[in-house]
């Protein structure tokens, strides 16, 4: 398996940051009440992941090991500030909706973890691919969870998409069900915990089924040599 395919498989499935590593649960549970919020935070996290991985990889040979963590945090904080300013300028409604969870990306264990575990030990291109696929894995889980909660809670899909994509995206709104009132359990943190648990359980079931379908390799019987004298 090529390195690119291995990074893709790790980020999207085998070592998914949300479903396997269980990192970044605070924003995952708090922000994923709608697809728009989930996608906005996912894109922001992905950009910071790629940027921090590339930057850390470029300077990895010039930073003393004793101060590498503070340096990594400064790099991540700088990139998060840039993303926050861009979102404030071009997606102000979404910026207000996400609130404190944008600057909290600095403390996201996914980002500092990939910087320390992978980017600081590899060249810029593999580091960028690692950040991209880890970010895509996180974004995918965010969007799927956001879609589940939005449909069950409000009966809609892509509500408020214009906050992220512009006024033309208001046409993307889909009314799946018509509710007289919102189903608050799905929209509040308990619903997020239940949703994440269901997604983790589904992944485990799929992994078990895939493992069961793989042909079992029978180990050849090894005959023990006689070591005693006749």
Curated annotation (Swiss-Prot):
GO biological process annotations for this chain's record?
A: electron transport chain
Family annotation (Pfam families): Rnf-Nqr (PF02508)
Q: Name where it mostly resides.
A: membrane
Naming one, the record's GO cellular component terms include:
plasma membrane
Top-tier EC class:
translocase
Reading the lineage from the top rank, the first entry is: Bacteria
Give the EC number: 7.-.-.-
Transmembrane feature ranges: 39-59, 69-89, 93-113, 125-145, 182-202
Q: How does it sit in the membrane?
A: Multi-pass membrane protein
Query: Could you confirm whether the keyword Electron transport appears in this record?
Result: yes
Keywords on this record?
Answer: Cell inner membrane, Cell membrane, Electron transport, Membrane, Translocase, Transmembrane, Transmembrane helix, Transport
Q: Where's it found, cell-wise?
A: Cell inner membrane
What are the cysteine partners in each disulfide bond? none
* PANTHER family assigned to the protein according to its UniProt record, in alphabetical order: ELECTRON TRANSPORT COMPLEX PROTEIN RNFE, ION-TRANSLOCATING OXIDOREDUCTASE COMPLEX SUBUNIT E
What NCBIfam families does this protein's entry cite?
PRK12405.1 (NF009070), rnfE (TIGR01948)
Quaternary context: The complex is composed of six subunits: RnfA, RnfB, RnfC, RnfD, RnfE and RnfG.
What is this protein's function?
A: Part of a membrane-bound complex that couples electron transfer with translocation of ions across the membrane.
Which family, according to the similarity comment? Belongs to the NqrDE/RnfAE family.
What name appears for this protein in its UniProt entry?
Ion-translocating oxidoreductase complex subunit E
Species: Vibrio vulnificus (strain YJ016)
Q: What is the lineage of its organism?
A: Bacteria, Pseudomonadati, Pseudomonadota, Gammaproteobacteria, Vibrionales
